[in-house]
Regions:
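Short, Lys/Arg-enriched N-terminal segments with co-localized hydrophobic residues
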Residues: 1-14
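Conserved loop->alpha-helix
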Residues: 13-167
Length: 167
């Protein structure tokens, strides 16, 4: 594959903004060896194509099946270990965002849909018009935040205010 084609595939076609497009309900969960197939329904299912990327709680997953108003994606074991998708149950809702094209309007941050690890929200402060969340994560896996950078939580891109070694 020519380098220019790789750039198109891996950079331009797989960008998300961290702005949630819609909530989607988990309709079915099917385990196959170490993989899990999730079936969802949402208002834009009719616009999806096989092999299209969609962020589910911020995790880039590929559409593998479309059946009427429902579509299916597959999460591999590593994805299930590093995300909260393995905790989903039928009836739960996830945040969805379709990938944007490079020439589309860019209103959020650059989000790739690759997950480093999960964290735990340890405090939420109401600042009268905005919110401050403290999220603890495993510092042994590396500092995943940069002051004034962004972090994506369940698909929602947020600006980092105070970056510490473990939060």
């Amino acid at each position: 594959i020519p380098y220019s084609k790789l750039i198109k595939v891996f950079i331009f076609d797989l960008m998300f903004t961290g702005i949630i497009e819609i909530l989607s309900k988990v309709e079915a969960i099917e385990k196959e060896n170490t993989n899990v197939h999730f079936t969802f329904s949402c208002a834009f299912t009719h616009e999806l194509k096989i092999d299209q990327s969609v962020a589910h709680n911020g995790v880039c997953l590929t559409v593998v099946k479309i059946n009427g108003s429902q579509y299916t994606v597959t999460a591999i074991d590593e994805t299930l270990q590093k995300t909260n998708l393995g905790n989903l149950k039928v009836g739960d809702y996830v945040n969805l965002e379709r990938c944007m094209s490079a020439n589309g309007r860019f209103d959020g941050h650059i989000v790739q849909g690759h997950v480093d690890q999960t964290g735990v929200v340890t405090s939420i402060i109401d600042n009268q018009g905005s919110w401050t969340y403290t999220v603890k994560y495993n510092h042994q896996l590396g500092n995943v935040t940069v002051e004034k950078g962004s972090i994506t939580i369940n698909g929602t891109s947020l600006t980092v205010v105070d970056s510490k070694d473990d939060s």
